[in-house]
């Protein structure tokens, strides 16, 4: 099982024999790169060796650095990590529009299903669980209406988990925790996308010219309930 390494106190990060070397005052901690899913650095004064950054890129391990407010602000991503890079990106550019609609519908269906399963796992309202199942089925029946079904389902879902007064994107502790978790998840997904030879800016449904992670933001939808679950506890 791979772990997310959270750095808050360490003075320096380096590498030794394919192991992350954490230097903290007089202590040395070593962790095999094979056991690392991602590294989050919250100490802005931590020194990170260039050779470590190269090895992390080679192993598709995102390095996420937070600002002074502890918000994930920067993450590393490998540039050329696939032997058929040009072929994959050309395929991605030419993805069929109808196929993308079908894929997006499948993503939303799975997202709502995962939300429903989490509500059920947390023993939330049976009525809300049933309503999300209805919206999931509606997505299957009407591909073009998936975004509307997602919006309704998400409103019910979030208020069921975090309370009737909860509103997404407001400036509060729960939203800050959700945003933090989503940013970490987004960085991990982006590294996996690049490892497969695709480009994270070329999305399935997201297509903003100002967003470098459109495809990451498509794929993350299915996995958001993982973060929601962690924040709930």
What are these regions (language model features)?
Residues 1-28:
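N-terminal, Lys/Arg-enriched amphipathic/low-complexity engagement segments
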Residues 2-4, 10-11, 58, 63, ...:
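Active-site helix-to-loop segments that bind/position phosphate- or nucleotide-bearing substrates
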Residues 21, 39-41, 61-67, 71:
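Short hydrophobic alpha-helical runs that function as membrane-insertion/retention elements
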Residues 27, 45-46, 70:
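Short, glycine-/Ser/Thr-/acidic-enriched flexible segments
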Residues 31-33:
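Core beta-strand elements of the Rossmann-like FAD/NAD(P) dinucleotide-binding domain
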Residues 35-47:
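Extracellular/luminal Protease-associated
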Residues 51-55:
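A short acidic, amphipathic alpha-helical/loop segment
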């Amino acid at each position: 099982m791979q772990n997310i390494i959270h750095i808050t106190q360490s003075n320096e990060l380096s590498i030794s024999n394919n192991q992350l070397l954490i230097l903290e005052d007089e202590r040395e901690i070593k962790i095999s790169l094979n056991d690392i899913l991602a590294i989050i650095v919250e100490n802005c004064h931590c020194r990170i060796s260039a050779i470590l950054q190269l090895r992390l890129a080679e192993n598709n391990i995102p390095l996420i650095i937070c600002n002074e407010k502890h918000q994930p602000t920067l993450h590393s991503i490998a540039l050329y990590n696939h032997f058929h890079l040009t072929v994959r990106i050309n395929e991605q550019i030419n993805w069929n529009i109808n196929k993308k609609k079908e894929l997006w519908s499948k993503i939303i269906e799975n997202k709502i299903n995962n939300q429903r399963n989490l509500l059920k796992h947390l023993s939330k309202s049976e009525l809300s669980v049933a309503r999300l199942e209805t919206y999931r089925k509606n997505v299957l029946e009407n591909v073009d209406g998936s975004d509307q079904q997602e919006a309704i389902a998400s409103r019910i879902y979030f208020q069921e988990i975090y309370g009737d007064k909860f509103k997404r994107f407001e400036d509060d502790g729960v939203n800050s925790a959700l945003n933090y978790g989503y940013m970490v998840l987004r960085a991990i997904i982006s590294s996996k996308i690049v490892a497969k030879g695709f480009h994270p800016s070329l999305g399935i449904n997201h297509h903003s010219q100002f967003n470098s992670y459109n495809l990451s933001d498509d794929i993350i939808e299915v996995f958001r309930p993982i973060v929601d679950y962690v924040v709930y506890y």
